[in-house]
């Protein structure tokens, strides 16, 4: 699955593309980021 160019909301790293991290300071506002 290709990585989306936009940051998408997530709950865990599994929601993100491979090699991306689920990051955020609040539980409701976590986003996928590329390392």
From Swiss-Prot:
Gene3D superfamilies: 4.10.75.20. GO terms for molecular function: serine-type endopeptidase inhibitor activity; toxin activity. Disulfide bonds join 3-17, 10-22, 16-32. GO terms for cellular component: extracellular region. Expressed by the venom gland. The record marks 5-6 as: Reactive bond. Keywords: Disulfide bond, Knottin, Neurotoxin, Protease inhibitor, Secreted, Serine protease inhibitor, Toxin. It is found in: Secreted. The keyword RNA-binding does not apply. It holds the Pfam family Squash. Belongs to the protease inhibitor I7 (squash-type serine protease inhibitor) family. The presence of a 'disulfide through disulfide knot' structurally defines this protein as a knottin. Neurotoxin. This is U14-ctenitoxin-Pn1a. It comes from Phoneutria nigriventer.
């Amino acid at each position: 699955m290709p990585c989306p160019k936009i940051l998408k909301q997530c709950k865990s790293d599994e929601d993100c593309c491979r090699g991306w991290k689920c990051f955020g300071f609040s539980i409701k506002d976590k986003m996928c980021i590329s390392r």
